């Protein structure tokens, strides 16, 4: 497990002052995707913004080819700088890009899923832990029922199974998420945080063949149909986009 790192960077001078009294015209868009997105041919509406424009992409992945991605474009809100804490070993994997700018219709850079890395990339060489878990990710409990979940062979040191639920947040744009996937026995709870985005997950890890088949709407473990979990660890994962102090005119993307 890596040691959490904290960054605080301050942008001085005019970058902190969102200059100009005239309102900017910015693209406005909010949508949740369950696969790759492409906005290159989409005509986006506009909105008048007093301070600046922003565009944010936030993605959560099981690590086994199931993902939920939020895309938001609109007015810049929140602080222009802020602290970040991250742990590269936290699971499940996530990624975020936050970009701010201060000219008309400048929030048009993040158009396709190419802005994100592959969060389900198999290790090379491809080694397996010998554990099999259910894997799913969706925005409704029925999206993650055992019947709709895939059985996956876990990678490398991921010898535990995880299940849980929570919310993905970009400002006041928020969606629920329900998830099952592989995890490490440590069931790392130290995710990442930032002032602009967050993914707040509650759940637990278990050990045993396909042990993560209980209801994803409950936090405490129920009766398992296979081997009982070893000392389930109740956890809250804060897997927010690890963003370090962005000023308008900059963009940052980090994995967790």
UniProtKB/Swiss-Prot annotation:
Would the keyword Membrane turn up in this protein's UniProt record? yes
Name listed for the protein in its UniProt record = Ly6/PLAUR domain-containing protein 5
User: Record keywords: Lipoprotein included?
Assistant: yes
Residues annotated for lipidation of the kind GPI-anchor amidated serine are 225
Q: Which residues form the UPAR/Ly6 domain?
A: 133-212
Membrane disposition: Lipid-anchor; GPI-anchor
Organism of origin is: Mus musculus (Mouse)
Q: Which residues are glycosylated?
A: 118, 172
Task: Give the matching InterPro entries.
Answer: CD59_antigen_CS, LY6_UPA_recep-like, Snake_toxin-like_sf
Instruction: Print the keywords alphabetically.
Output: Cell membrane, Glycoprotein, GPI-anchor, Lipoprotein, Membrane, Repeat, Signal
Gene3D superfamilies, alphabetized: CD59
Propiece residue ranges:
226-256
Which residue positions does the secretion signal occupy? 1-25
Major location (coarse): membrane
Record PANTHER family = LY6_PLAUR DOMAIN-CONTAINING PROTEIN 5, UROKINASE PLASMINOGEN ACTIVATOR SURFACE RECEPTOR-RELATED
Q: Where in the cell is it found?
A: Cell membrane
Q: Which GO terms describe its cellular component?
A: plasma membrane; side of membrane
């Amino acid at each position: 497990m890596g040691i959490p790192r904290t960054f605080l960077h301050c942008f001085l001078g005019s970058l902190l002052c969102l200059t100009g009294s005239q309102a900017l015209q910015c693209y406005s868009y909010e949508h949740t995707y369950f696969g790759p997105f492409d906005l290159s041919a989409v005509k986006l509406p506009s909105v008048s913004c007093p301070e600046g424009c922003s565009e944010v992409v936030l993605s959560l992945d099981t690590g086994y080819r199931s993902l939920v991605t939020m895309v938001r474009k609109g007015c810049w809100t929140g602080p222009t700088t802020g602290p970040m804490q991250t742990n590269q070993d936290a699971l499940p994997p996530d990624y975020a890009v936050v970009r701010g700018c201060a000219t008309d219709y400048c929030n048009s850079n993040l158009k396709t899923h190419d802005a994100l890395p592959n969060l389900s990339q198999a290790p090379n060489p491809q080694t397996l832990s010998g554990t099999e878990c259910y894997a799913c990710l969706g925005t409704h409990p029925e999206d993650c029922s055992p019947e709709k979940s895939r059985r996956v062979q876990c990678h490398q040191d991921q010898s535990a199974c995880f299940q849980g639920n929570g919310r993905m947040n970009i400002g006041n744009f928020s969606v629920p998420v329900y998830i099952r996937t592989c995890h490490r026995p440590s069931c790392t709870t130290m995710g990442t945080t930032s002032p602009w985005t967050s993914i707040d997950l509650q759940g637990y890890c278990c050990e045993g063949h396909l042990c993560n088949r209980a209801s994803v709407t409950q936090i405490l473990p129920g009766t398992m149909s296979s081997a009982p979990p070893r000392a389930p660890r109740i956890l809250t994962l804060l897997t927010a986009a690890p963003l370090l102090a962005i000023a308008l005119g900059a963009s940052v993307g980090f994995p967790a």
